[in-house]
Amino acid sequence: MQKSGLIKLCFPAAWLVATSWMFAAPAPIQRGQLKHGAPLQAEQKSVPAKPAPAKAAPAKKTAPPKAAPAKKPAPAKPALAKKPAPVKPASAKAPPPAPAASYGPRAPYRGAIAVDADTGRVLFADNMRTPGYPASVTKLMTFLLVLEDVQAGLYRLDDRAVASPLAASMEPSSVGLRPGQSMTIHDLLLSIMVKSANDAAETLAEHAALAHLRRRGAPPQDVSPADLCAAFVARMNRRAQELGMRDTRYASPNGLPPPRGSKRGFDVSTAADLVELGKVLVRMPKALSYTSCPSCTVTDGAGKPLTLVGHNYFIPKNPDPKRLCTPLPECDGLKTGFTNASGCSIMLTAHRNGRRVIVVVLGSAGRHEREKAAGHILRDALDAISIW
């Protein structure tokens, strides 16, 4: 009886000792889980575990491994999903549609201007300082320099200029010059003003450069056609600066785009610059006699007559086959220009009651846009000077 009573008294005490871990353990587990970011409610559910003393120690060891896997997928997967957003591919495709230095055609034009040739008064201006490719309007500077050489007595209009292989290789428009063939300066000037012949412009450029070398006493036989052309183009740019054509850069005597693989670049100008060239040309003796020709006959390099038909349909007696513009009786020049890269350009001049205007339309998207814009601007300019 005493043993059983002692056992009864000792059993509650032993039970309390064995189960006392259940009341002391939860607090540290909760603090540990909060430090690692695990939710407190989820940890509280695991507190009322079975009171087996042997499982108490493993319970603490297995808790951290469960929390660790929970941390890995949560931050890693969403972060990776945000990084491959399609922002960078879009920015990589943005630059190509906007090339850095593209001065191609625009509707209705890249720039336009009309001035009173006598006073310099601007009658109309729209983007007059916007650069563009003048195409064959470039030939007007070649035309001016050759006329100035003739005036200076460097050579005469009836002198003959010989076509080089470089000149003969120019693409159309052309008068069909072959290497070694020659034409008079007069006929070559008609060829570039009426027909817009690229081979004629190159031949004139080389002939003019050669004449300047001879005047300085340089040996011309050691100079290639390409070097002669480069010397003439340098002179074109010097003359442009003298005329105040500050945004103009000539690269050829004819306005053709650069060949593939070439480093020379395009001829570049503005409507405001080109009108400065026009002011000088309309004061040049005999200049308008060339620019006002609707058609003419020259003697080609083979000694045969060659009829040339002009492209300026604002000039009287030169009807437009496509009827895109109506000739003006007062119009007597100057030059059209077109390439695929440059679009359509034109410089016009006309006079009324002793007053003269000059109009430039640069870089139109097509002939229709060019003729429409140039016709409106020219007629309005003539009306404006008539009432002043």
Name the predicted role of every residue range.
Residues 2-27:
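Sec-dependent N-terminal signal peptides
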Residues 27-40, 45, 98-100, 105-109, ...:
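Penicillin-recognizing serine hydrolase domain
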Residues 130, 169-174, 253-261:
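Surface-exposed aromatic
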Residues 120, 137-146, 161, 192, ...:
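Residue-level preference for non-acidic, small/hydrophobic
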Residues 148-166, 287-293:
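Short, well-structured active-site flanking segments
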Residues 168-194:
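Signal peptide-directed extracytoplasmic domains
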Residues 121-129, 183-185, 328-331:
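Glycine/charged-rich beta-loop-alpha catalytic/anionic-binding loops adjacent to active sites
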Residues 28-37, 43-50, 55, 60-61, ...:
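Beta-lactamase-like hydrolase cores
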